[in-house]
Amino acid sequence: MSPLQRGMTPEEGAALLIHAYERGVRFLDTADLYGTYPHIRLALKDAPDYVVSTKAYVWDEATAAAALERAFRGIGRDYIDLFMLHEQESLYTLRGHEEALKYLRRQKELGHIGAVGVSTHFSGCVRAATRFPMIEVIHPLINRAGIGIQDGTREDMEDAIRMARDFGIGIFAMKPLGGGHLISDNAAALRYAIESPLLDSVAMGMQTFDEIDANVAAFEGDFSKMERLKDRPRKIMVHDWCEGCGRCAERCRQKAIAVVDGRAVVDASKCVFCGYCARACPQFCIKVV
């Protein structure tokens, strides 16, 4: 629903969130970057018991305080259930952002945050997070094929998650369908995430009522509805007004974008459809659909 992807209005996004809530979903994840606070704020009027997780690019007290305030104002609450540092990479990035982590821990002690965490595509970061006692939750990229893991294989990430769990850290996965690459075998991919003893929860992007119904049914043990979702592949559109500035290529952690003959070109085999390239584009010519 984000402006980075489908670009839904707050009313359209809220309708999806309320439908999911009515089907029993009680946890939602967003980010400062995604631009979906208005959608969530509207949905919370009819779905008040949602547990809300968000994340932001913050590195010190000032940036963390500003991002937390944006979340409070954005969703209309004075409490965030889970606040995370967005896209952490390693021990070194965690050390470089430690001031923000300490600030968030103080906010938890004051009752403004339920838990502090980090999101990452790196197994090394999952391991490094165990060295920071204020980190209680990790949001790692993990799926059946290991698509999108930046520094190793699925097995490397599983080993890192196992280590984090030994430290009592909660785990909720991202991209169980590998950004859409596993859509042709979506039932097996989702079954892996649901049945894994390493994962406490799974965050799934859903853009339609059918997707919500099929995924909820799968979590209840009925995978039969997944078949009808296989004909909905995702893609990135680069519009004609692309100037070839290269900012999208610089932003892409998957190295899935290059500038060729003055225009951004996407390697779909590497892309995980996160949409972050769209945010980096100064001409607003990239969209995930």
State the predicted function of each range.
Residues 226-244, 255-273, 287-289:
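Ferredoxin-like iron-sulfur electron-transfer modules
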